[in-house]
Design a protein with these regions (language model features):
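N-terminal leader regions that mediate targeting or early regulatory function
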Residues: 1-93, 102, 110-113, 119-120, ...
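Post-transcriptional modification and biogenesis factors for structured RNAs
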Residues: 125
Length: 137
């Protein structure tokens, strides 16, 4: 929990994050907003490691992890968020040849999916990213 906002409730879509955005609001961001907004990714894809770049980002406790793993809605929304971000990556190629925040986002998403859902989904996500890289070269 960060600033009295439940990460589980946020992922289930019933509570906004500390910026007053619901998960649906983030999914509705334009590509320009996705590229230029840097504090949403930690909410869509929380991990048990503090962010070096967003001190207000949620850090999952063991109880948060269990609650998310036991929430069908949170897991469904995590999967949707992963596909949403894959679609963003597929629409662009500038992220492929440079090490930038999108590469860090990809690492975070992979870690989040592994931690909260399963290793296979994490690997499928990374495989899709690699397919985009190959196709866009």
């Amino acid at each position: 929990m960060t600033n009295n906002v439940s990460i589980v409730d946020f992922l289930e879509g019933v509570e906004p994050n500390i910026n007053k955005l619901y998960i649906q609001d983030i999914w509705d961001l334009s590509d320009e907003e996705i590229e230029n907004t840097h504090d949403f990714i930690q909410w869509l894809f929380p991990t048990d490691t503090p962010s070096r770049y967003n001190l207000a980002a949620p850090v999952l406790s063991e109880q948060d992890i269990l609650n998310i793993q036991n929430s069908k809605k949170a897991k469904k929304n995590l999967k949707y968020s992963a596909n949403w971000f894959l679609n963003f990556l597929d629409r662009h190629s500038y992220w492929i040849d440079k090490h930038d925040h999108n590469q860090l986002r990809i690492k975070r998403i992979k870690k989040c999916l592994r931690l909260l859902i399963d290793k296979n989904l994490s690997e499928k996500f990374l495989n899709r990213v690699n397919e985009f890289k190959e196709r866009k070269k």
